[in-house]
Amino acid sequence: MIKKIGVLTSGGDSPGMNAAIRGVVRAALSEGLEVFGIYDGYLGLYEDRMEKLDRYSVSDMINRGGTFLGSARFPEFRDDSVRAKAIENLQNRGIDALVVIGGDGSYMGAKRLTEEGFPCIGLPGTIDNDVAGTDYTIGFFTALETVVEAIDRLRDTSSSHQRISIVEVMGRYCGDLTLAAAIAGGCEFIVLPEIEFNREDLVCEIKAGIDKGKKHAIVAITEHICDIDELARHIEQETKRETRATVLGHIQRGGSPVAYDRILASRMGAYAIELLLQGYGGRCVGIQNEKMVHHDIIDAIENMKRPFKGDWLETAKKLY
């Protein structure tokens, strides 16, 4: 019988994490459970930095970006002795289960705890939208708004100067954020990690646009594909059009979460408590077709594939 739970945020922060923590805390308290907030992710779990939370601990948090519990990358958590100490800390406080909010790296920590017999529920918190088992992750739509606003501003200055602008978007090895922002921002060209990149093909496409009378263009590209400053120089040399590169960087992770992320985070937080009370452990929560779902966390990490939004790309191509 679950009586006490812990909640932590891990890995890169995303807007809506505070709303998810709030959802976990308020839903747990409504069921008579005690909740402990764990500071700075798995590092704080290992160092036994925890604090009991009440409903006032999460007051005025739903609208805040980031995570008030803090987050830290802690690769040492892969070590068996480190995890053993973390589990000992949980057991010493009488904590029966753990809710982990983060991306696939955070899920890996929850997976290892699950394999060692400690019940965990994972909530997908990342702007990258790269977690299997869910259509969308907490923070994706807020980051999308941030990127689209930046693209809109760049278009203003690009059109004024008849310039080509390259915008680098976060996402690691997932192009969802870039693709969605490119559609919403009306970008002329899209470069994604899921599609093999050939810079000469891109140059040819840009030249074709210029030949048709295009005065300016926006190229949206996911991070880690190439050096965008070098790409900008090459495009400028080949097209004779001024070309500038912009890296949006960590601004994409910040800001007050949009309404959808607040709702999604709240639903997922409450659903995590529902699963724990039903006796589930070792699960990860997702949303599919607007319904809450859960999957085996080990299966999600090892076997499930995140589908590429090919239909979105086809739509984008029609609108170039």
Curated annotation (Swiss-Prot):
Reactions accelerated catalytically: beta-D-fructose 6-phosphate + ATP = beta-D-fructose 1,6-bisphosphate + ADP + H(+)
Chain residues that bind ADP: 22-26, 55-60, 155, 186-188, 212, 214-216
GO BP, sorted A to Z: canonical glycolysis; fructose 1,6-bisphosphate metabolic process; fructose 6-phosphate metabolic process
E.C. number(s) listed in UniProt: 2.7.1.11
Requisite cofactors: Mg(2+)
Catalytic residues (positions): 128 (proton acceptor)
Binding site for substrate: 126-128, 163, 170-172, 223, 244, 250-253
Binding site residues for Mg(2+): 104
Enzyme class, first EC level, given as a word: transferase
Pathway of action: Carbohydrate degradation; glycolysis; D-glyceraldehyde 3-phosphate and glycerone phosphate from D-glucose: step 3/4
CC annotations in GO: 6-phosphofructokinase complex
Keyword Kinase: yes
Pfam family, one: PFK
Modulation of this protein's activity: Allosterically activated by ADP and other diphosphonucleosides, and allosterically inhibited by phosphoenolpyruvate.
Positions of ATP binding: 12, 73-74, 103-106
Compartments (UniProt record): Cytoplasm
PROSITE patterns in UniProt: PHOSPHOFRUCTOKINASE
GO molecular function per UniProt: 6-phosphofructokinase activity; AMP binding; ATP binding; fructose-6-phosphate binding; identical protein binding; metal ion binding; monosaccharide binding
Assembly behavior: Homotetramer.
Family statement drawn from the similarity comment of this UniProt entry: Belongs to the phosphofructokinase type A (PFKA) family. ATP-dependent PFK group I subfamily. Prokaryotic clade 'B1' sub-subfamily.
Function description: Catalyzes the phosphorylation of D-fructose 6-phosphate to fructose 1,6-bisphosphate by ATP, the first committing step of glycolysis.
Protein name: ATP-dependent 6-phosphofructokinase
Gene: pfkA
